[in-house]
Amino acid sequence: MPVLHIAAALSEVAPRRAPRAAPRRSRWRTLTLVVALTTATPGVANEPAPDDTPDLSAYWTRERKAVALNAGIVGAVGLYGFTMWGWGETGFEARSEGWFGRDTRHGGADKLGHAYTGSVATALGAALYRRWGYDEAHAARLGALSGVLLTTAVEVGDGFSPKHKFSWEDQVSNLAGVGFEYLRLRHARLRERMHFRWEYFPSPAVRHGRHEDITTDYSGSRWLLAFPLRAWGLGDSSLKWFELQVGYGTRGFARRDERYFDAARRHPFVGIGIHIPLVLERFGAGAGTRRVFEHIQIPGTALPLPP
């Protein structure tokens, strides 16, 4: 609206032939222009005195930020669970889902998904805490706390859902992922030598619009541990550009996948890949960017390729 007032005022104050009453009208439009400018332009007429501005930085100490973050995790998870996942529609119930057997619902891919979620939640939490001024050790502990809080809140909430239920196998996987990342954060040598990654390329069901949630698109996912060769004594060799990988994925377990796969299959694998963090380092990428690819595997940069 201030732009409209300015345009109208300028059109009225421009020289032109007009009746004698026009100047009065122009004064009203000019007044509108002044009001619009003083209310729309910061620091011209309505800037508060310095003493009137609350010092939020002094209030938001790193401790308060940590409390707010973890309270926000619980609140956001609860809100989403009650509105989207049907939490609270039944009493609490637990069930065993098994691990990696052929007769399980997802062939064990979901267990690696839980572990990966715990790992990434811990890494992201620790990064936030470091930014807020915590040292490496304290940030790692708080990151692990946030990772446990997030994954446990989801799993306990699932216990009150008519569809999912609480699974001890899921919770063990959650804690394993949190614990693994905590150890990586506390021990730089381990962090250099082992990366836990997710590789994703949309499955046929997603590409054809039959499924939308990529986090449960197990036929498009696989998870792996990568061992960069440069961290295992080969830093001066041309082999430093490569890494050994051990991983697992499944295909065709979901009903939506039946038309695209002839059978449900599990795919453990051992392979070799390009060490992307080193490539990025040579191109001048910062540490933050390189850390992302400690957790993400780019499709097509490792063999064997997914089935």
Please name every model-derived segment.
Residues 184-233:
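Primarily interfacial, aromatic-capped hydrophobic alpha-helices that serve as membrane anchors
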Residues 174, 217-223, 264-268:
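Residues that define the transmembrane beta-barrel architecture of outer-membrane proteins
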Residues 153-175:
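Interfacial helix-loop-helix junctions of multi-pass membrane proteins
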Residues 150, 192-196, 240-246, 270:
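Transmembrane beta-strands of outer-membrane beta-barrel proteins
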Residues 20-23, 31-111, 115-134, 237-240, ...:
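N-terminal targeting leaders of membrane proteins
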Residues 179-183, 223-229, 270-276:
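Residues on the lipid-exposed face of transmembrane beta-strands in outer-membrane beta-barrel proteins
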Residues 1-25:
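N-terminal secretory signal peptides that target proteins for export/translocation
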Residues 200-204, 231, 248-252, 276-278:
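Transmembrane beta-strands of outer-membrane beta-barrel pores
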